[in-house]
Regions:
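Solvent-exposed interaction patches of small proteins and small membrane subunits
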Residues: 1-136
Length: 136
């Protein structure tokens, strides 16, 4: 069986790459339709990897949660994340954008990514970057 430590470290590496791409995509202040679609896609990927990262870390800590909602709730209770309600909103918007597309919704979600969801992912990134440094 794979060492759980290795599992979350590998997941963090994948999350970090996608998070940094999302960060770059956010540099476009007035994105075109294509740039906005890319930004939303990077958010979807980063969000998916964020809850997978939390799931791997929680498993290492002896916490069992399998759905994104359960993982987020457990992470909030364990104080790995703050603003649990905002994480749940991000999950809802990620699911919405994965299954539907409208320009109006895309613009609204882009604004939420910029002002609400990216800061959540940034906080998670910084936490796990620190945890990774502590393992070296």
């Amino acid at each position: 069986m794979e060492d759980p430590d290795i599992c979350w470290v590998q997941r963090f590496s994948n999350f970090e790459r996608t998070f940094l791409l999302l960060s770059k995509a956010l540099e476009f202040e007035s994105p075109s339709v294509i740039e906005r679609a890319g930004l939303i896609h990077f958010f979807e990927m980063a969000f998916e990897l964020s809850w997978n990262l939390l799931e791997d870390y929680e498993e290492q800590e002896g916490i069992t949660a399998k759905t994104p909602r359960e993982v987020i709730k457990q992470a909030y209770q364990a104080e790995l994340i703050s603003r649990g309600h905002d994480w749940m909103n991000a999950l809802q918007d990620r699911n919405l954008m994965a299954h539907t597309y409208s320009k109006k919704t895309a613009i609204a979600v882009e604004a939420k990514i910029r002002h609400e969801y990216f800061p959540l992912l940034d906080e998670l990134y910084r936490l796990f970057k620190t945890k990774l440094e502590a393992t070296k």
